[in-house]
Design a protein with these regions (language model features):
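Aromatic-lined substrate-binding rim segments of carbohydrate-active enzymes
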Residues: 1-43, 127
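Short intrinsically disordered, low-complexity coil segments enriched in acidic
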Residues: 1-8, 112, 204-207
Length: 207
């Protein structure tokens, strides 16, 4: 589902009925054909108006706006959709940072991720409240790496690469807490000012 088809600017009080009807027709046809949909709620398609106003998930206002969006679609498609993904390839936020990325770029990327982690956890909570039958999960890009040799240094480097590019996002969403190696990653990139006040309140929620 494209967020901007439901809330074109992201901040409307009422959803776009034409957008809701479009997806209802799609899901109804799938049901008639015996196809069970797996729906991605966000696929790098934040409404442009929000990007221009608040930046790329760098403002906590996104959390409440995403909550409104998911509440709308969970209610609208109850009984038609059971399987949901909160964020598509969420780990690509950090996977595609260049090797020479600045500390500021890393700071923004990890702050961006945290707000999405909280929004994802809230979506799981809301989705289960609306329909206990909902199955809500996360989706990671398969950024798999392998050690160059069996040398312990190569093995450790590969482990740390997997931790940063893959397991960091997976652990938070599957286990509901930041993994122990998160502090190492933050230190390596001089990340010292993350706004993670909601972590205890929300990130324990999982599908």
């Amino acid at each position: 589902i494209s967020w901007s088809r439901i809330y074109p600017t992201g901040e409307e009080e009422k959803p776009n009925q034409a957008g809701l009807d479009f997806y209802r027709n799609v899901f109804t046809e799938l049901r008639n054909a015996g196809i069970e949909p797996l729906v991605s709620i966000w696929h790098f398609d934040t409404p442009l108006a929000l990007e221009e106003k608040y930046g790329d998930w760098l403002d906590r206002k996104y959390i409440a706006l995403y909550e409104k969006y998911v509440t709308t679609i969970f209610n609208e498609y109850k009984g038609l959709v059971k399987y949901w993904l909160t964020f598509n390839e969420i780990n690509n936020t950090i996977n595609f940072l260049p090797d020479n990325a600045s500390d500021e770029a890393y700071q923004e990327a990890y702050q961006h991720l945290h707000y999405q982690f909280v929004a994802s956890a809230r979506a799981v909570q809301i989705g289960h409240e609306i329909d206990p039958e909902n199955k809500i999960g996360c989706m990671l890009a398969g950024a798999i790496t392998y050690p160059h040799t069996c040398d312990p240094k190569d093995m450790l480097l590969n482990q740390q690469t997997m931790e940063e590019n893959f397991w960091y996002c997976g652990d938070v969403q599957c286990f509901g807490a930041y993994p122990p190696f998160a502090k190492r990653i933050w230190k390596e990139h001089n990340i010292t000012d993350l706004d993670i006040t909601e972590a205890v309140s929300y990130t324990h929620l999982r599908a």
